[in-house]
């Protein structure tokens, strides 16, 4: 039932319209839509909204879905091989001088060792560290590349890795109205 609701919500026509997106409302609904799935996987997701009342982004809701669904699915994949017992995804959305700053952090396995010296390579097309049991690369390597491409189409927007002690962190910034 949750997948049906998730699917129907994802294909709403209004998500493909250029509109003013209430970011507080968007992220509240986004997190709520993921909670049942994450609960079954024993992953806690936490949302912090800081100074976000009345904050709008002019854009396509489908763009935000593409970006943040990718972040969640990457975290789920990271937790598959993590020994972490208290699996947590933290989403912090704040209004900072006319910009929406969205920090997305999990306490999973973090970046693969191969990216420690050149972490921004993960934004390249076809770049993946996901391998099968014979060490063949099987991930598409397109998720973060697509996210970066979407973000680059918004004025004064950016995506960057966040340095975190444990796990993985990524920040997106959008100019808001």
Question: Which residues are covered by each model-predicted region?
Answer:
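Short conserved segment of the HATPase_c
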Residues: 111-126
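Acidic ATP/Mg2+-coordinating residue in the GHKL
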Residues: 106
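Conserved DHp (HisKA) dimerization/phosphotransfer helix of two-component histidine kinases, i.e.
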Residues: 1-43
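Glycine-rich ATP-binding loops of the HATPase_c
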Residues: 155-163
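Conserved catalytic submotifs in the C-terminal HATPase_c
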Residues: 44-55
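Short beta-strand/loop element within the Bergerat-fold HATPase_c
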Residues: 86-98
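Conserved glycine-/histidine-rich ATP-lid loop and adjacent helix of the Bergerat-fold HATPase_c
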Residues: 146-156
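Conserved ATP-binding N-box helix of the HATPase_c
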Residues: 63-82
């Amino acid at each position: 039932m949750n997948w049906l609701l998730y699917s129907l919500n994802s294909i709403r026509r209004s998500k493909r319209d250029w509109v003013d997106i209430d970011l507080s409302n968007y992220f509240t609904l986004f997190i709520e839509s993921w909670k049942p799935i994450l609960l079954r996987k024993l992953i806690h997701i936490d949302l912090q909204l800081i100074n976000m009342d009345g904050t709008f982004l002019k854009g396509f809701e489908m763009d935000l879905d593409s970006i943040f669904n990718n972040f969640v699915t990457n975290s789920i994949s990271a937790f598959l091989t993590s020994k972490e017992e208290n699996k947590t995804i933290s989403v912090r959305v704040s209004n900072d001088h006319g910009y929406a700053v969205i920090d997305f952090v999990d306490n999973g396995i973090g970046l693969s060792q191969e990216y420690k010296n050149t972490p921004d390579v993960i934004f390249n097309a076809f770049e993946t560290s996901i391998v099968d049991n014979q060490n063949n690369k099987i991930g598409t390597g397109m998720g973060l590349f697509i996210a970066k491409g979407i973000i680059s189409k918004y004025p004064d927007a950016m995506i960057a890795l966040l340095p975190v002690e444990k796990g993985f962190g990524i920040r997106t910034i959008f100019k808001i109205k």
